[in-house]
Amino acid sequence: MAALSSRILIVDDDVETCRLIAELVAAPGRELHQCQTAAKAIELAQKDTFDLVISDINLNGPESGLDVLKAFKQAYPGGEVVLISGFGTLDTAVQAVRAGAFDYISKPFNIAEVRATVGRALARDSKGGTTAEQVSGVPPEGIIGRTAGMLAVYKQIAYAVDSMAPVLIQGESGTGKELVARAIHVHGARAARPFVVVNCGAITETLLESELFGHVRGAFTGAIADRKGVFEQAHSGTVFLDEIGDMPPAMQVKLLRVLQDGEVRPVGGNRTIHTDARVVAATNVDLDRSVADQRFRQDLYYRLSVIVIHLPALRDRREDIPLLIEQFVRNASARTGRHVTISPDATAALMSYRWPGNVRELENTIERLVVFSRGRVELADLPATVLAAPSLEERMFQGLPSLDELERRYLVHVLEALGGNRSRAAEVLGIDRRTLYRMAERLGIALKDDAERAT
């Protein structure tokens, strides 16, 4: 087993971070080495053999962790590399995985994640696992976020780009599902080919069939010429099927056939056309429930959900809101020629709002604020819906009973448990009977006298 004789090199320009990682991954049979520069790590990789390299991406000096990865994979293709970064973004996650990294971990560390990742990397090294081929860096797509939920999304995108399998993106309206679909396309081998979008819930069944599969001249009224469907248009590219959960049942059958056979038949046509388009679908509905309710085909669901990416709602990643605000203000300011800032109080209120429309609603709100701003957006400038929302602190205690209500419930519970015996109740509560009477009167509780209890 590799774990019995594993040599691990830890690379970080911070000595304390190196020591911390070493403590986390130390185990019997593991030989740990540390260095603080990419140059030293590359030198060691060329002179010695390691089963695993754990390196920060951002290192002091001209070379980065990606350079360490490249040198190590050239010197020892059978080894594994885990990259670490304190500035988790989609670009770094994709570059790391596609450059051949086994995995990508963000700071601050999750102890269990670090240990599990190292264990899996050593296990795969012992089996001679393969890695992704090296490619160049990639441009940003406008996906913003550093919370754990978004870092998980970045990892899923990074794994999806090198696969030709269908992808299902789940998330509420406005969470950025099309952005994720485009990111998968532009990072993959099909980036130079078409990316075609179809909203399955926005057009009728007849038009949807023609949109997807095309039609021949005379197939229906108004079909005055042959027309290619999106699967033919996107040959060797990507078809993005938005709102797939709203697709009519009859169309689900035909889509399933395309996924199974790689062929489409235009409406009114008598021949099939081969298509090599990759399918990325998105939905804001619970497809598991739709399958259970027989509104969505189970076999199609299985075909589409080979890779599943779940986008968190904005309310579940509030820490990303300031980053989003900053980007949206920058974009809107560039379009309008205005220099606008958002006050801390306004930012806090924007973070407190639940954003039912998610990122799209936030972006539209910021756009309006910039357009009508006189230079600085204050709390009073925010929409009434945002101002009316409870603060984070208020929402934390929302729905909790008042102290009087808790006191009342407790007194009723004690009295019922003791059969209404006032003396025993006072004793249990640690008060005298007079205080018990005053408490009951204040809380609106009628105390039965001994005669009433006897009956």
Predicted features, each with a name:
Residues 29-39, 44, 418:
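Short hydrophobic/Thr-rich beta-strand motif most characteristic of the beta2 strand and flanking loop
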